[in-house]
Regions:
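Conserved non-transmembrane functional hotspots
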Residues: 1-62, 66, 72-135
Length: 135
């Protein structure tokens, strides 16, 4: 029969897992921030061009295409919920960092505290999935 896991191994394993989520959420917050802001700026510029089509003769000839691009871009932004995904990733990145800090300040042999932090982490993972995945 194998020996029960040493508290330090459980502690280190939990720290590695939380650290992995910190890196993951940070990476995806950057990705979704870029998608969100690039799409928003593009939509604003294209919509402004469509609105100014009467004053800008060169744009008048492609106004219908620009209007279509604005409609498609807006639909994609709404469907993908880029803002919600971006906010979800950066919000949970902060939460994972706070949990990691709590873990760092906890003695590895304090099994009860480590187990409580693990339960908190598991709940956080479920909440994280809900926050960043579109409905």
């Amino acid at each position: 029969m194998p020996e029960p896991a040493h508290p330090k191994n459980h502690y280190d394993s939990l720290k590695r897992e939380v650290d992995g989520y910190i890196k993951y959420s940070h990476t995806w917050s950057i990705v979704w921030a870029n998608v969100y802001y690039l799409l928003r700026v593009t939509l604003i510029v294209l919509a402004a061009c469509v609105a100014a089509k009467d004053s800008l003769p060169r744009i008048a000839s492609v106004a219908a295409v620009l209007s279509l691009l604005v409609a498609v871009g807006t639909a994609l932004d709404t469907w993908l919920k880029t803002g919600n995904r971006y906010r979800g990733h950066y919000t949970f990145n902060d939460k994972f960092i706070a949990l990691y800090t709590d873990l760092e300040l906890t003695d590895a042999t304090d099994t009860e505290k480590v187990n409580n932090l693990e339960l908190e982490f598991k709940k956080m993972i479920g909440d994280y999935s809900v926050a960043v995945l579109p409905e």
